[in-house]
């Protein structure tokens, strides 16, 4: 009885601990101690399905002892549809804790596939749920990647009225761990019709693994039209003149990928005729209702070159190249103009007289100051109508890997070593072969608005930096190189801006052919065709590594919260339970030993 009396308090304590653990399990709080990979150098990716419970608050940190970035994708998110973004969400932070910069937030109201990228080798995400008792499922997939390594043909910019593109390696298996973004943008007043000729991606009901995401606008924040995978051939139509397509793949089951094409559909209703000028063509839109007065549906309309035919849809559309279809190019008073004529004459039973209206549409594009001026003349029985509009030159600037200017660098931001040679090219996108690009001024700035401070690399066509080399005139391309530098006062980014002149290549007296000219001699005010391009940011590699953690990265862990069933209180309970078991066992053994003391071994006396 004495033994029972002594053991009773310990027994009650053990039962109390067990009851506490049983109650915690009955409440259904999910464990936040999911083991995320990353500390192991051999592990480059991880996927997991999280089954979340009410009143959850969990935080995970992904780390890797290597200078790589992390891309995390939430390809399937099922949260409380009635919950607010404040009470139930997923937050992603750049760094080792939730105190780092917020990369973004995910909730049930989001209309996109959430994808986030860290600036260094650490990333943290936190999941908070409300008290509603519903099913919640989140598929999380992340992997480590090097921003300075790109996959060929993975994404790009498409700006023609029609075109096609495919997944990398198509029709061979697509690459693993790929994230490709294609931006499609056509001229104003058009919509985009996207048609997938083939899609062969991993089949999954929720498209969690390999998928295509189509967005109705210029970015992945524009609104999701569809997320597809498997073996389907869907068609999508934008509501504006831009569309974004994303391909995301995981680490297994690579198939053929996809093949897609797109066309443009004129979206606006017009009463007569409109004209749009770009760097390589004139685009004329004629209303079919306007042509009804001529008993025509557009089939009898033609340019100066009758072999150039219009495209017939809900409107009649002419795409007139600046160097074809009979377009006349003229240089006068430091100005370049392009002119063509659209004519129509109804068939007549007599070769002498006609009682039908005659139609002649004169279209003219004039290159102006940092823009193109569009003029259209319509003559109908000696009545002339005119319309004016404004556009801009189509120029772009890019970095290249070498002085061969063959392989473009697509990373942004682009991380470089101090004093590394950078190769820059400004391109004029036009079909006119008789134009040449001249680099007038190029400068650098630590900010994208080019406020103070700025640093001149090229001015008046002359190199202002000892490492800067300007290449000779080369058609539609202006090229130069310089060595990477950093602005003082810890400004990590560098942006480049170039102002260029566009000249007639046959004019040997043009400013472009004069090369480097001192300020007192230069005069470009009369030049109407000039424009500028911007690229950036460029950052030093040491700035990138400094933003991450130094030293050995510890194992990925979960922060402890009050809602975790295996928090410090429960851990302490387990320790008490184990200690009590050991104590009970010790007392029991000692009790039985004391009861049989006569069988003890005794030390023999020495003789």
From Swiss-Prot:
Disulphide-bridged cysteine pairs: 17-58, 85-107, 154-180, 207-229, 442-498
Origin superkingdom: Eukaryota
Carbohydrate-modified residues: 29, 57, 67, 394, 419
PROSITE patterns listed in its UniProt record: CUB, ZP_2
CDD domains in the record: CUB
Cellular compartments annotated: Zymogen granule membrane
Span of the signal peptide: 1-24
Side Cytoplasmic, residues: 590-607
Pfam families attached to this UniProt entry: CUB (PF00431), Zona_pellucida (PF00100), ZP-N (PF23344)
A biological process term (GO) from this entry: cell adhesion
Record key words, sorted: Cell adhesion, Cell cycle, Cell division, Cytoplasmic vesicle, Disulfide bond, Glycoprotein, Membrane, Repeat, Signal, Transmembrane, Transmembrane helix
Residue intervals passing through the bilayer: 569-589
Topology feature Lumenal, residues: 25-568
Domain (CUB): residue spans on this chain: 25-146, 154-265
Membrane topology: Single-pass type I membrane protein
Tissue spec. comment: Detected in pancreas and epithelium of ovary. Expressed at higher levels in ovarian tumors than in normal tissue.
Domain ZP stretches: 276-519
A cellular component annotation (GO) from this entry: extracellular space
Known role: Localized to zymogen granules, where it functions in trypsinogen activation. May indirectly regulate cell motility, cell-cell and cell/extracellular matrix interactions.
Name the UniProt record assigns to this protein: CUB and zona pellucida-like domain-containing protein 1
Organism, as annotated: Homo sapiens
Lineage: Eukaryota, Metazoa, Chordata, Craniata, Vertebrata
